């Protein structure tokens, strides 16, 4: 197919990469790739370096994050493109460094992106036990490892961001075989899948974006899990009962808005694991959680981000 697709390239900071993918949730995006120099540097230095990095070094990845999103060349594109530009411009309102903040678009052949982006995704250890593996990659699992199969073709959180790692490590610590887990803003389903693979009794992932819901359902199927439900809608409207653990990897402002409602969905003595919180906003979120009746159990930090574990 000739020139049927449009590639939108967003040059931003590593810090804002997760938020930019969130912006893309609200558009008709068909594929996303994320090239983040920080991820590459961290993995090169990690003791859990899972593969040969020469291949990535040859890619000449720029400083910061380069996010490429792919759209059909149709009448809706100009609307989406303007929305993306405006949203990236306003990232600083959420306390995020947008970096260069440059947004450009060009037409590409389908084959230019359909497979090339896959070279940026490799098996990555994101917790003490959990490894996330793209479906097309081979990986020899170690005895104590739990492998999540993920197709990041829609790239709703691939596990490499600090906030995802923080949430996964918290789930590793708190999930047990009796746990019911609710995952707010499930995206790719990665946190729901992690909880299920950690032997949670039952997991419910919810998202307000139908594209994310479809992506999460596909990833659940890839992992052959029967203890997960993925639902479209608002937690308060689509979920019955209470959870031992509610996890949310979203922006600090959204956590503050949701905190009071989340309290109603956590059993007494249960936990609210929240991340997507830049360190500058930590105290704001803690204050709101305490106002809603949570006790702060623990705060974990990775880079410029934190994860707050609060007890109901």
From Swiss-Prot:
GO CC term, one of those recorded: cytoplasm
Reaction equations catalysed: L-lysyl-[protein] + 3 S-adenosyl-L-methionine = N(6),N(6),N(6)-trimethyl-L-lysyl-[protein] + 3 S-adenosyl-L-homocysteine + 3 H(+)
Keyword Ligase: no
Top EC group: transferase
Pfam families: PrmA (PF06325)
Keywords, ordered alphabetically: Cytoplasm, Methyltransferase, S-adenosyl-L-methionine, Transferase
Binding sites annotated in the UniProt record for S-adenosyl-L-methionine: 164, 185, 207, 249
Keyword Methyltransferase tagged: yes
EC number: 2.1.1.-
InterPro entries: Ribosomal_L11_MeTrfase_PrmA, Ribosomal_PrmA_MeTrfase, SAM-dependent_MTases_sf
Main location: cytoplasm
Localization annotation: Cytoplasm
One annotated GO biological process: methylation
Superkingdom: Bacteria
The family this protein is said to belong to: Belongs to the methyltransferase superfamily. PrmA family.
PANTHER family: ELECTRON TRANSFER FLAVOPROTEIN BETA SUBUNIT LYSINE METHYLTRANSFERASE
Name of the protein in its database record: Ribosomal protein L11 methyltransferase
Organism of provenance: Clostridium novyi (strain NT)
Gene name as annotated: prmA
């Amino acid at each position: 197919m000739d020139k049927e697709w449009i590639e939108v390239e967003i040059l931003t900071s590593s810090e804002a990469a997760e938020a930019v993918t969130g912006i893309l949730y609200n558009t008709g995006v068909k594929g996303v790739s994320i090239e983040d120099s920080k991820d590459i540097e961290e993995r090169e230095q990690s003791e859990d370096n899972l593969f040969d990095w020469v291949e990535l070094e040859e890619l000449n990845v720029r400083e910061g994050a380069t996010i490429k999103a792919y759209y059909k060349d149709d009448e809706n594109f100009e609307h989406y493109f303007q929305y993306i530009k405006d949203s990236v411009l306003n990232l600083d309102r959420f306390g995020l460094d947008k970096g260069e903040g440059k947004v450009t678009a060009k037409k590409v052949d389908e084959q230019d992106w359909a497979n090339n982006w896959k070279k940026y995704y490799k098996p990555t250890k994101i917790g003490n036990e959990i490894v996330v593996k793209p479906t097309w990659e081979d990986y020899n699992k170690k005895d104590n490892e739990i492998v999540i199969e993920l197709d990041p073709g829609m790239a709703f959180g691939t596990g490499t961001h600090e906030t995802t790692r923080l949430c996964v490590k918290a789930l590793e610590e708190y999930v047990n075989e009796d746990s019911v887990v609710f995952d707010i803003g499930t995206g790719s389903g990665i946190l729901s899948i992690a909880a299920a693979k950690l032997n949670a009794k039952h997991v419910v992932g919810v998202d307000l974006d139908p594209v994310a819901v479809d992506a999460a359902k596909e990833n659940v199927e890839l992992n052959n899990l029967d203890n997960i439900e993925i639902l479209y809608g608002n937690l308060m409207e689509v979920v019955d009962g209470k959870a031992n653990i509610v996890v949310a990897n979203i922006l600090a402002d959204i956590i503050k808005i949701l905190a009071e409602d989340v309290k109603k969905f956590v059993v007494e003595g249960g936990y609210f694991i929240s991340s997507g919180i830049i360190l500058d906003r930590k105290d704001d979120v803690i204050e709101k959680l305490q106002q809603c009746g949570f006790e702060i159990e623990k705060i974990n930090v990775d880079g410029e981000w934190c994860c707050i574990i609060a007890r109901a």
